[in-house]
Amino acid sequence: MEIKKLEAMIEAILFTMGEAVEVERIASALDHDVDTIRKIIHNMMDRYEGDERGIKIIELDNSFQMCTKAQMYEAIVKIAHVPKKHILTDVLLESLSIIAYKQPITKQQIESIRGVKSDHAVNKLVEYNLVCEVGRMDAPGRPILFGTTEDFLRNFGIASLEDLPVVAPEKVADFKMEAEEEVQLQLDI
């Protein structure tokens, strides 16, 4: 099958699905190997970025999705329903960061790291579809394990969790020292 026809079929699949589609599913549907399909999609991504188009293809973990470019927001908002913007407070961002870096993680483990109850924060993050239940821990009570979602990757503009910034060891030491000082201050009061 020629490249142009494969590109057209990939484009049709991504457009029709409207959500991220695993590269393996695309390859299987087109009866081609995964590496060839991935290479074709990456070439398409480059072309979409270079052209004056309103859409692009993004990569999320091992999946691809067709979506609109951020620059098209002004035109789209005039015709489409504008979804309610979610406000990520410092508490939500802190909890989300812990989940993103430590997943899969239980609510109790999050609370242990934060030092305060995290029910509200985790529930809000689930409501915003940034985190979800990814399983249960094999421990008494079988606590729920949480992890990030594709919406998390999409909203933060990263392709996979490996793209999360690495926290420098000296920063970790600084944060640890600050936390210990804060705990000591609370004990002294």
Curated annotation (Swiss-Prot):
Protein name from the UniProt record: Segregation and condensation protein B
The organism's place on the tree of life at top rank: Bacteria
Keywords: Cell cycle, Cell division, Chromosome partition, Cytoplasm
Annotated GO biological process: cell division; chromosome separation; DNA replication
GO cellular component, one term: cytoplasm
SUPFAM superfamilies (alphabetical): Winged helix' DNA-binding domain (SSF46785)
Function statement: Participates in chromosomal partition during cell division. May act via the formation of a condensin-like complex containing Smc and ScpA that pull DNA away from mid-cell into both cell halves.
Gene that produces this protein: scpB
Family: Belongs to the ScpB family.
